[in-house]
């Protein structure tokens, strides 16, 4: 009889978690600009966030060992990038300059809603299209950095966080 009560309690807790877990209404889990800093692993597995949108201001959801924590990103913010031109397929051009985004539509054309591949001149960084897939924590596999930026990955692979706080070339979500 006590085992049944324990099962009911566990089922109730799972149901409660499912009911109170926020679901994205838009389906967009946009990643914030910048790169996660190299964080010291946290011995207790803390799940402060799962996506960048869970963090306040410009903070990003970063891996620290088996933990996910909100941290101030490294690298230039979008406002610090200037003179970067990005071509959105054949439907329009976006220019980022002095922190402002300008989109020009060609006559009769529509601007693509997919994120463009951005080249940050002078930094040698090329961000590829798509988003990094979500990672179940902890994830088994190589716990070492295989890349720092998308341009170090072959084909359309992106440099994404793996489950142990390191970066690996991964097939993106579109």
From Swiss-Prot:
Pfam families, per the entry: WAP
First-listed, main subcellular location of the protein, grouped into a coarse class: secreted
Biological role stated in the UniProt entry: Broad range protease inhibitor.
GO cellular component: extracellular region
Cysteines joined through disulfide linkages: 36-62, 45-66, 49-61, 55-70, 132-160, 143-164, 147-159, 153-169
Self-association state and partner proteins as the record states: Homotrimer; disulfide-linked.
InterPro entries documented for this protein: Elafin-like_sf, WAP_dom, WAP_four-disulfide_core
Keyword Repeat appears in the UniProt entry: yes
Gene it is expressed from: Wfdc2
Protein name: WAP four-disulfide core domain protein 2
PROSITE patterns linked to this entry: WAP
Biased composition (Polar residues): 83-98
Region of interest (Disordered), ranges: 68-117
Limits of the WAP domain: 29-74, 125-173
């Amino acid at each position: 009889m006590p085992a049944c009560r324990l099962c009911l309690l566990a089922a109730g807790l799972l149901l409660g978690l499912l009911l109170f877990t926020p679901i994205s209404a838009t389906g967009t889990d946009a990643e914030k600009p910048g790169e996660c800093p190299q964080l010291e692993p946290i011995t207790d597995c803390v799940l402060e966030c799962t996506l960048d949108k869970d963090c306040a201001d410009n903070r990003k959801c970063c891996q620290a060992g088996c933990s996910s924590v909100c941290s101030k990103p490294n690298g230039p913010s979008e406002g610090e990038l200037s003179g970067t031109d990005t071509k959105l397929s054949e439907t329009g051009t976006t220019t980022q300059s002095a922190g402002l985004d300008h989109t020009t539509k060609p006559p009769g054309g529509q601007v693509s809603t997919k994120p463009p591949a951005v080249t940050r001149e002078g930094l040698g960084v090329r961000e590829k299209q798509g988003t990094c897939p979500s990672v179940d924590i902890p994830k088994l596999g190589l716990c070492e950095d295989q890349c720092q930026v998308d341009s170090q990955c072959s084909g359309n692979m992106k440099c994404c966080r793996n489950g142990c706080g390191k970066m690996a070339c991964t097939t993106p979500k579109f």
